[in-house]
Amino acid sequence: MKKIIVLAALILGFSVAAAAQPRAIGLRIGNGGEISYQHTLGQNFLEVDGGLGLGFDGVFNVGATGIYNFMIAQPQWTDRGEWGFYAGPGATVGLGLGDANYLTLAAAGMVGLEYTFWFPLQLSLDFRQHLGFSFGEKPFWAPSSIALSVRYRF
């Protein structure tokens, strides 16, 4: 009986902890499309984006970016919903296949503005810069993008 009570308390504790960690999933549309996932860690959040694309050079691209964003400010511009300015560092790994094959490793930085509605929808506009190396056809890699993200918060 004691083990059942301890097990029930652990399950309840993990459920409460999971409910207290807001997450969001959606699309990030900029130079291409990416699936975007955010996980709040206290005041800040981790963002992981992954995408597929076909570049202008005929190369099929697949890549993933992970960024730890710091919430810089949360101005109270509206009565409902929440605004937030954020910025953070991260890393990108990518692979290009086609006429030019390459592997890309890069540092990434992002700065953005988000609005979370009073219902579970979030919009954000961000600027992301990459700086790194490609092993293969392209020796140096430094693209940037401006993107709009739409996410469902849960």
Indicate residue ranges for each PLM-predicted region.
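Transmembrane beta-strands of outer-membrane beta-barrel proteins
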Residues: 23-27, 46-50, 83-91, 105-107, ...
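Residues on the lipid-exposed face of transmembrane beta-strands in outer-membrane beta-barrel proteins
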Residues: 35-39, 64-70, 89-93, 109-115, ...
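Residues that define the transmembrane beta-barrel architecture of outer-membrane proteins
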Residues: 21, 29-33, 44, 58-64, ...
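Outer-membrane beta-barrel domain signature
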Residues: 23-24, 55-57, 76-78, 97-102, ...
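Predominantly the C-terminal beta-signal and adjacent terminal strand-loop region
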Residues: 118-154
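Short loop/turn motifs that connect adjacent beta-strands in outer-membrane beta-barrel proteins
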Residues: 19-22, 44-45, 73-84, 99-101, ...
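Transmembrane beta-strands of outer-membrane beta-barrel pores
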Residues: 29-33, 41-43, 52-56, 70-72, ...
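Cleavable N-terminal export/targeting peptides
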Residues: 1-22
